[in-house]
């Protein structure tokens, strides 16, 4: 297995499953830290701040710092502020997205006359919120969605994800949004900028082919699939572009790196 200078690492299905740590996750991060190999946690979750993500990882005894976390909310805020500094935004979403947009100097407004409409996962979504978003897009606002995940795993089962909420606005307006999170290259390019490394020097680690592995493939990066989450070994082997590597878990990846 190739020795990479850094790793981009998915969270749910790779580091943990719900509230349970996945075997090998802590060991992999400890291995990287001992070797002095940089890594970033790259997540499509827009509802949490980096501090909240870090807290969850630390509760599982997985070492993490807020500056090592790249959320779809942060990538979205960065994307908009680079295009239109100080722009006005109508948003659906949680505290993670609100904080990211505000800290980027963007102005959050609660009406349809805005520069951008941004859809993030909103667990308190209402018809009125969707109505305002729809009117905003119809009024000419640039339509952004933090991530395309149509379903998310919860204790009760798979529940509607941000892609499902986004699709309501998209179908109503006939306008397709710009997605920011995995598998789009935007969040990956942001992570590479933070690392200061070329894509050839970095590998993407994740469990879900359609988001994690495709995010690496779409940006031309090597990919490491772990069979600890959604996509099975059979799933990824049958794809037109399989991952560079596939391991039972991250313990197996460590064993390969140590050869």
From Swiss-Prot:
InterPro entries: HAD-like_sf, HAD-SF_hydro_IIA, HAD-SF_hydro_IIA_hyp1, HAD_sf
Keywords noted in UniProt: Hydrolase, Magnesium, Metal-binding
Gene Ontology terms: cellular component: cytoplasm
EC class of the enzyme, as a word: hydrolase
MF GO annotations: metal ion binding; phosphatase activity
Described function: Catalyzes the dephosphorylation of 2-6 carbon acid sugars in vitro.
Family assignment from sequence similarity: Belongs to the HAD-like hydrolase superfamily. NagD family.
Protein name in the entry: Acid sugar phosphatase
């Amino acid at each position: 297995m190739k020795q990479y200078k850094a790793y981009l690492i998915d969270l749910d299905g790779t580091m943990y499953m719900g509230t349970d740590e996945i075997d090998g996750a802590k060991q992999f991060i400890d291995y990287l830290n001992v070797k002095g190999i940089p890594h970033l946690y790259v997540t499509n979750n827009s509802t949490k701040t980096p501090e909240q993500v870090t807290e969850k990882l630390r509760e599982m005894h997985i070492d993490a710092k807020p500056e090592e976390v790249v959320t779809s909310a942060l990538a979205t805020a960065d994307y908009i502020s680079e295009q239109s500094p100080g722009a006005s935004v109508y948003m659906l979403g949680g505290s993670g997205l609100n904080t990211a947009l505000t800290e980027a100097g963007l102005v959050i407004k609660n009406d349809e006359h805005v520069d951008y409409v941004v859809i993030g996962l909103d667990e308190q979504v209402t018809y009125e919120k969707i109505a305002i978003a729809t009117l905003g897009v119809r009024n000419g606002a640039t339509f952004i969605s933090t991530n395309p995940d149509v379903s998310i795993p919860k204790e009760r089962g798979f529940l509607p994800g941000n892609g499902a909420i986004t699709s309501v606005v998209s179908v109503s307006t006939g306008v397709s949004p710009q997605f920011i999170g995995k598998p789009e290259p935007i969040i990956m390019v942001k992570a590479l900028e933070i690392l200061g490394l070329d894509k050839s020097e970095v590998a993407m680690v994740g469990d879900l082919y359609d988001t994690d592995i495709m995010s690496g493939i779409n940006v031309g990066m090597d990919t490491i699939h772990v069979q600890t989450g959604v996509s099975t070994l059979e799933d990824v082997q049958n794809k037109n572009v399989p991952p560079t590597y596939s391991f039972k878990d991250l313990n197996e990846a460590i064993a390969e790196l140590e050869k």
